[in-house]
């Protein structure tokens, strides 16, 4: 996932 997406994961990510 993308950090700029919004979703915050332990690995550091984001979903748009």
UniProtKB/Swiss-Prot annotation:
* Keyword terms: Adaptive immunity, Blood coagulation, Coiled coil, Disulfide bond, Hemostasis, Immunity, Innate immunity, Secreted
A single Gene Ontology CC annotation of this entry is:
extracellular region
Q: How is it modified after translation?
A: Conversion of fibrinogen to fibrin is triggered by thrombin, which cleaves fibrinopeptides A and B from alpha and beta chains, and thus exposes the N-terminal polymerization sites responsible for the formation of the soft clot. The soft clot is converted into the hard clot by factor XIIIA which catalyzes the epsilon-(gamma-glutamyl)lysine cross-linking between gamma chains (stronger) and between alpha chains (weaker) of different monomers. Forms F13A-mediated cross-links between a glutamine and the epsilon-amino group of a lysine residue, forming fibronectin-fibrinogen heteropolymers.
One biological process term in Gene Ontology: blood coagulation
**Compartments where located:** Secreted
Q: Subunit comment for this entry?
A: Heterohexamer; disulfide linked. Contains 2 sets of 3 non-identical chains (alpha, beta and gamma). The 2 heterotrimers are in head to head conformation with the N-termini in a small central domain.
Domain comment quoted from the record:
A long coiled coil structure formed by 3 polypeptide chains connects the central nodule to the C-terminal domains (distal nodules). The long C-terminal ends of the alpha chains fold back, contributing a fourth strand to the coiled coil structure.
Q: What functional role does this protein have? A: Cleaved by the protease thrombin to yield monomers which, together with fibrinogen beta (FGB) and fibrinogen gamma (FGG), polymerize to form an insoluble fibrin matrix. Fibrin has a major function in hemostasis as one of the primary components of blood clots. In addition, functions during the early stages of wound repair to stabilize the lesion and guide cell migration during re-epithelialization. Was originally thought to be essential for platelet aggregation, based on in vitro studies using anticoagulated blood.
Instruction: State what protein this is by name.
Output: Fibrinogen alpha chain
Q: What organism, scientifically named, is this protein from? A: Odocoileus hemionus (Mule deer)
Starting at the broadest rank, the lineage of the source organism is: Eukaryota, Metazoa, Chordata, Craniata, Vertebrata
Q: Which gene underlies this protein?
A: FGA
């Amino acid at each position: 996932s993308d950090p700029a997406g919004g979703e915050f994961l332990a690995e550091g990510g984001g979903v748009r």
